[in-house]
Structure formats: structure tokens, C-alpha cells
Amino acid sequence: MGVTKKPDLNDPVLRAKLAKGMGHNYYGEPAWPNDLLYIFPVVILGTIACNVGLAVLEPSMIGEPADPFATPLEILPEWYFFPVFQILRTVPNKLLGVLLMVSVPTGLLTVPFLENVNKFQNPFRRPVATTVFLIGTAVALWLGIGATLPIDKSLTLGLF
């Protein structure tokens, strides 16, 4: 750890610079009014113009009309619900499935209390949290991929 030199506030040159506003609290130009009144509205209006331009030039197609009498064979949720859908689909008891879904965020909330870490550290110095993260990621990917397959191949991912 290096030795830091504290500024001498009795130095007349330093006092003159601080009096002119050249101290630690003066960095570049102020945000008001330059950024907030001139730059931000241009960026916001430019973003809105790009979105409107893309919507006008390349509109998304509406698709086929809905038919309430023709239901697809299997209804799948959005991709980020695939692991939860797979848990509910494979567990025979509904209460157990709901408890398993509740246990995931509960388990994630307990991870910081498992290790005695007061500040951010290298992941290699936090083996429990790193292991929980890696296993959780692998299980979420496994469940997510399995949710897209038929029920008889979902647990083995069709490999066995």
C-alpha cells in the first residue's frame, strides 16, 4: 500500500487554485443547463424517431387470425418460464411443485448468509456461492431445454 501525501492547505498556490474553483469538486463543465436542457432531449427525441421510423418502414405482421376452436397440441410458456414449467410438469403433486418453485428464490436468498463475506471478493474465494451458482445454472438450463421436449424425453433430454 502506497503512502498518500495530504495537501497542504496553507500553501498559497493551492489556496489560489481552490479559490478559482479548480479543486476536487470541479470536473469539466456542469450538467445544468448544458446536458439536461440540450443534449438529453436530442437523445430522447432521436430514440423516439428511430423507433417510429422502424415501425413505419418495417411493420410487424399481425399473423393469422385467432381460432378458438383450433387449439395447438401443446401450449408452451415464454422461454424464461421454461424451468418453472418443467418443474410443474414433471412433479406429480401440485403442492410439491409449488413448494419447489418457492424454494428456488428462498435458497438464493440464503446463499449470502452461508459464507462469512463482508465485502465483494473473488469468486474463487467464495466456493459455496460459486458452486451454488454453477449448479443452479446447469439445472436451469437442463430444465429449460427439457421443457421444450415431449414429457417422456424431457428428463433425459432425449439422450438416453
UniProtKB/Swiss-Prot annotation:
Spans traversing the lipid bilayer: 36-56, 95-115, 131-151
Location of this chain's protein in the cell: Plastid, Chloroplast thylakoid membrane
SUPFAM superfamilies: a domain/subunit of cytochrome bc1 complex (Ubiquinol-cytochrome c reductase)
A GO CC term assigned to this protein in UniProt: chloroplast thylakoid membrane
Family note: Belongs to the cytochrome b family. PetD subfamily.
Molecular functions (GO terms): electron transporter, transferring electrons within cytochrome b6/f complex of photosystem II activity; electron transporter, transferring electrons within the cyclic electron transport pathway of photosynthesis activity; oxidoreductase activity
Membrane topology: Multi-pass membrane protein
Entry-linked NCBIfam families: cytb6_f_IV
Predominant subcellular localization, coarse grouping: plastid
Key words, A-Z: Chloroplast, Electron transport, Membrane, Photosynthesis, Plastid, Thylakoid, Transmembrane, Transmembrane helix, Transport
Matches recorded under HAMAP family: Cytb6_f_subIV
Subunit structure: The 4 large subunits of the cytochrome b6-f complex are cytochrome b6, subunit IV (17 kDa polypeptide, petD), cytochrome f and the Rieske protein, while the 4 small subunits are petG, petL, petM and petN. The complex functions as a dimer.
Further comment found in the protein's record: A longer mRNA that is not produced by splicing has been shown to be transcribed in barley and maize. It is not known if this mRNA is translated.
The protein's name: Cytochrome b6-f complex subunit 4
PANTHER family the record matches: CYTOCHROME B
Primary role: Component of the cytochrome b6-f complex, which mediates electron transfer between photosystem II (PSII) and photosystem I (PSI), cyclic electron flow around PSI, and state transitions.
Pfam families to which the protein is assigned, alphabetical: Cytochrom_B_C
Keyword ATP-binding: no
Gene Ontology biological process: photosynthetic electron transport chain
Organism superkingdom: Eukaryota
Leader sequence residues: none
